[in-house]
């Protein structure tokens, strides 16, 4: 079965009332194993490649310093592996970029074969996050790719980015965000 965008899978979770996990894969063997487990349970799969994993899979061992070219190569390598191991599968599979750091990272993932991307502008001021997310939505939707945006920040370290405090999402801001960017999947920290 070919890879699918995130949106139809999320619509099915609402319609049929089930939860859906998403699993980060940082190597070809992990992608293969994740698909096999989902096939055993006849469950749809959301496999995620983090922005940093794309750099690593592009051959950059010091992935924190991966170039855009490294990320492009890595995104294609991850997508090729997921397509290879999912080609004969009867389950729907989404390949999602987890915590894309900027527009170019999202473009690299989409060009590589990802069917869904997350643009994480949560560390930006609200209006800048809206503008960045809107730009990604416009680019991605023109190519049939789903988009997830993010508001709010949890304290701690996520994808090697540290935040000392949490900023929970104001539900009214979430509605405003959604309306300003257009149709997208928004992760809210509430």
Go through the PLM ranges and name each one:
Residues 4-15, 28-90, 100-189:
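Alpha/beta enzyme core
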């Amino acid at each position: 079965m070919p890879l699918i965008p995130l949106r139809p899978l999320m619509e099915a979770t609402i319609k049929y009332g089930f939860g859906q996990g998403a699993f980060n894969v940082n190597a070809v063997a992990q992608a293969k194993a994740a698909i096999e487990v989902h096939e055993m349970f006849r469950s749809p799969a959301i496999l995620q490649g983090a922005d940093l994993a794309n750099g690593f899979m592009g051959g950059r061992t010091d992935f924190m310093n991966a170039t855009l070219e490294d990320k492009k190569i890595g995104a294609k390598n991850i997508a090729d592996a997921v397509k290879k191991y999912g080609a004969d599968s009867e389950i729907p599979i989404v390949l999602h970029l987890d915590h894309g750091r900027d527009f170019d990272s999202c473009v690299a993932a989409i060009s590589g074969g990802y069917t869904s991307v997350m643009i994480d502008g949560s560390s930006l001021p609200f209006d800048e996050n809206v503008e960045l997310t809107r730009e990604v939505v416009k680019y991605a939707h023109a190519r049939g790719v789903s988009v997830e945006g993010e508001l709010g920040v949890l304290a701690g370290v996520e994808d090697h980015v540290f935040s000392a405090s949490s900023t929970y999402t104001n539900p009214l801001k979430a509605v405003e965000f959604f309306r300003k960017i257009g149709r997208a999947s928004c992760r809210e920290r509430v």
